[in-house]
Amino acid sequence: MNKIETRLTELGIQLPEVSKPVANYIPAKRTGNLIYVAGQIPVENGIIKKGKLGEDLNLEESKYATKLCAIGCLAAIKTICSLDKVTSIVAMHGLVNSTSENTEQADAMNGASDFVVDVFGEIGKHTRTAVGVSVPHNIAASVYMVAEIKE
């Protein structure tokens, strides 16, 4: 077992199978030394977490949803290479399903950000956006990631 997978095990995280896309795109794509991960949704035990921050979900539930999205991002990266090849989590972009009055999207994205820093340490620190939107099918969040890898 490699270093990052060992860390995931220590955290009690098992990477899920990457879902097949439902449209004309792929879960992750490598170009040069970058891997772009398509928006991942929060899935736990095969169940999609749904709801809107400020209506159906509280902040802690939304943070957990973005963490699940980040776990999905790592699973997508692993379809291309070992997670030990990651040299930097460059960027994360979070779409948080929330009411128009809610302003806690950045706080909700901390679930994803804190998770990747916990897994990767300093190389997990990244640039980030967090916006409130109406996510299709009332899914709680969607997180997109860019990672740099070594050969």
Residue ranges and their predicted role:
Residues 1-151:
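Short, polar/acidic, helix-capping and beta-turn segments at strand->helix junctions
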